Structure formats: C-alpha cells, structure tokens
C-alpha cells in the first residue's frame, strides 16, 4: 500500500481517510495533465538553480511526457490507496526512476501545486467556453441577418407591446453573449497568473526562479505575494464562476424564450423535430426538452458563485481543507456549460421562424405607438395623438399601418450586427490563447 506524502509513523483511521478524501480522487482526474505540466516547469526551474542535474532533468522530463500522454488520452488512473493526483505522479516517477522521482517536490507544497493545477485547468477550460460562445454568437448573428426584416411582437410584462423583429431577437442574445465574454476575459486575467513558488503560502528558502516558471507556463504574470497566492484559492474560482454564471444566464433566458415561442399559443418559431421528444400518452406532442434542460442546467450554473462563497465564507488567511469542497462544484461546471452552448448552437442553426405572425389581427394594437409617432411628427401634440389612438383601439376602429421605418442605431432597420461582431472578435483576441498554447507545446517537446 503506497504511503501518503505526509505520512510519518502513525497510520490514519480508514473512516477518517474516506471522509477527508471524499471525491477528491475522482475530481483530481480533471487535473492530471495539468499537474504533470506544472511539474515539468517546476523541475526545469529546479535544474536551473542546481537542485537537479541535467541528466536527472532529462530523465524526469521524458517520463513526465509519457505520463502526460496517458493523462491526455484518458488512460491516467489514481491507484487504490493513493490520495490524490500529486501523489500518483510522484509514485509513478519513483517506481519507474527510483530516488530521482522523489526530488520533484523540492521547493513545492501541495498547496501551490493544486493552486497551479487549478489555474492551468481553468484557463484551458475558459478557452473552451470562449470558443463555444463565439460559435453561438456566430449562429445567432447569421439568423439575425437571415430574418432581419421579419417582424414579431415585442413584449413588456408578457403583454404585446411594440413591433420587434427576429433580427432584433437573435441579435440581442448575440450582443448579450458578447458582453458576457468581456467578463470572462476579466476572469481569465486573474486566472492567468502563476502561483507556483508560494509553497504552503509562505514561500521557500530555496532560491526559486518564479519568473522562469511564469515564462515556461505561458502566464501573463504571477501572484507576487506568496500569502496572497494562497488567499486566491477560492477567490479566483468565484471570479470565474461569476463569468460562467453570466453566460449561463443569457443562455437560460434564450432557452426560456425558445420554449415559449415554440408553443402553439405563440407559434413564432419551430424547433427541428429531431431536437424534440414525444409523450408516452399524447401522440401529438413535440416537447422542447433540450431547451428545458439547457435552462435548468444553466440556472444551476448561476448558483455556482453563491455555492463557492458559502464554502469559503469567513475563512482567515492561509489554506484550509474547506477549500477542497470547491472542486466538487467548480470543476464539472465547465463541461456542463459547454454542453449547453453546443446544444444551443446546434438548435439555433436549425430553428425555423414564422414569417406570417402579423397576419393575426390580435397583434394589430402593437402598431399603436407607430401611429402616435406619425401623428406627432405631423404636428399633433404627442399627448393628443396618444389619446386619439387609444380611443380608436377601445372603439375597435384602429387600422394599423404595418410598414415601419426605424433607422437609428440598434433598431429594427439598423441592427448593428457588424459592430457587435467586431466587439466580440476584439474581446476574443485579447485573451491571447495562442501564446499559452505556444508555451505549453514548447514545454512538452522532447
């Protein structure tokens, strides 16, 4: 049975071990390849300050690359009796290479090791989310342009209000996601800082070259103060969680609209048959289950910042085991959100719109504001025009003119989709994902 990295001459109670480890072994599989990547940078730095020989470094790097390949391919496992991913990697190195495998932990604590793993994992997953957000923005804008001239009712208080268009509806969600991307970029900025070298939260007596590991791992900068680096555990996850929650909020709202507009009482859009499910008793049913599940899962993601806040609430400075619990809600959230983004993009691309909604007379009254504005533009005082049209509606004599002419920025006739696209693309470019990829690939090269 492998010993714990911290074990001395007292064996821990089995029940205590099960309780304290919890689901950490399973969750650590999310972090496996990032743990290896961090170790590669760390030992490269250790060799530069004389704590490893060049031959030892070459041997360790070769074995770590093999472990990385297993982790990347999903073949990495944490053996029974091994506490976490850090212990498994060190065990494999020691088993295969002997005593040199025991040297990789010099100048490092599991505290800064897991901090590093989480940051490397998070920035990689942020990239996945950002790419899927951009794909959904693209589909929404394509539909907005395709149906830019198709009018639909706009609502306030769920009451028919004023003319809108599918160009506006699709485009509104594209712009909302473009704004959400700005928050995700801010979260990425705090994520892409190197905590390695903070050790247990108070640094090391070894002359660690933190600038070197920052450069090797493609970080923008480092968490400079070693105490703050440890204070960032939980804080950074919460910052990222707020960004994920913003995206989830937009997608959940869109899913609600789609379910509503797809219902027979609205009939504004039609979802593809292959994206709906049936009923075991009602043969006519085509249920929007995908959008309903997207809504539910995105609503759950919106609770993530509060869950993290409550776990870390009122903790003083330093590391506490409470923080382990954050991994259980935080790590799976990225895949949950990207799954929702993929499904939403797929269905939006195939969604059909009803181009004849306004043939129904029940929507005639929404053109009342257009008539009031026309009368006011002709010289009638606005309040008099408002009263005149209101009386016509009450008397049932109002005859709408359904030809509208909106030209100002962001209106039915001037969607500004090109500006929103440029804004989203500029935000995406600022992430600088390419520089991170280049650094990681260089580190992995033999």
Mark where each language-model region is:
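Short amphipathic alpha-helical segments with heptad-repeat character
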Residues: 119, 123-130, 134, 141, ...
């Amino acid at each position: 049975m492998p010993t714990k990295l911290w074990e001395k001459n007292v064996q821990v109670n089995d029940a205590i071990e099960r309780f304290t480890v919890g689901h950490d072994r399973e969750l650590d599989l999310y972090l496996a390849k990032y743990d290896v990547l961090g170790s590669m940078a760390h030992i490269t730095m250790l060799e530069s300050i004389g704590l490893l020989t060049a031959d030892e470094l070459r041997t360790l790097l070769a074995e770590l690359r093999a472990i990385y390949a297993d982790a990347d391919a999903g073949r990495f496992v944490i053996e029974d009796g091994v506490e976490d991913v850090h212990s498994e990697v060190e065990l494999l190195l020691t088993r295969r290479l002997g005593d040199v495998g025991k040297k990789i932990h010099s100048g490092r604590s599991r505290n800064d090791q897991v901090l590093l793993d989480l940051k490397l994992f998070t920035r990689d997953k942020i990239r996945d989310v950002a790419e899927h957000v951009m794909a959904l923005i693209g589909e929404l804008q394509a539909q907005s342009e395709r149906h830019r001239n198709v009018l639909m009712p706009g609502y306030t208080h769920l009451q028919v209000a004023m003319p809108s268009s599918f160009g506006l509806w699709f485009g509104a969600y594209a712009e909302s996601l473009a704004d959400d991307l700005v928050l995700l970029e801010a979260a990425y900025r705090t994520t892409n800082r190197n905590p390695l070298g903070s050790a247990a939260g108070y640094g090391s007596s070894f002359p660690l070259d933190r600038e070197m590991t920052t450069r090797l791992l493609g970080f923008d900068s480092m968490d400079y103060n070693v105490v703050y680096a440890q204070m960032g555990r939980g804080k950074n996850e919460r910052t990222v969680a707020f960004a994920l929650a913003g995206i989830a909020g937009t997608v959940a709202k869109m899913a609600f609209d789609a379910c509503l507009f797809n219902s027979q009482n609205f009939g504004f859009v039609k979802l593809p048959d292959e994206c709906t499910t049936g009923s075991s008793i009602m043969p006519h049913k085509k249920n929007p289950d995908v959008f309903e599940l997207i809504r539910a899962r995105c609503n759950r993601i919106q609770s993530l910042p509060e869950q993290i806040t409550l776990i870390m609430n009122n903790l003083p400075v330093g590391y506490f085991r409470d923080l382990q619990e954050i991994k259980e809600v935080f790590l799976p959230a990225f895949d949950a959100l990207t799954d929702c983004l993929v499904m939403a993009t797929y269905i939006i691309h195939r969604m059909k719109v009803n181009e004849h909604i306004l043939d129904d007379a029940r929507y005639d009254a929404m053109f009342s504001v257009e008539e009031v504005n026309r009368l006011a533009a002709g010289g009638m005082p606005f309040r008099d025009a408002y009263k005149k049209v209101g009386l016509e509606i009450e008397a049932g004599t109002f005859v709408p003119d359904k030809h509208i002419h909106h030209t100002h920025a962001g209106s039915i006739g001037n969607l500004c989709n090109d500006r929103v696209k440029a804004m989203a693309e500029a935000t995406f470019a600022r992430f600088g994902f390419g520089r991170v990829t280049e650094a990681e690939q260089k580190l992995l090269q033999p």
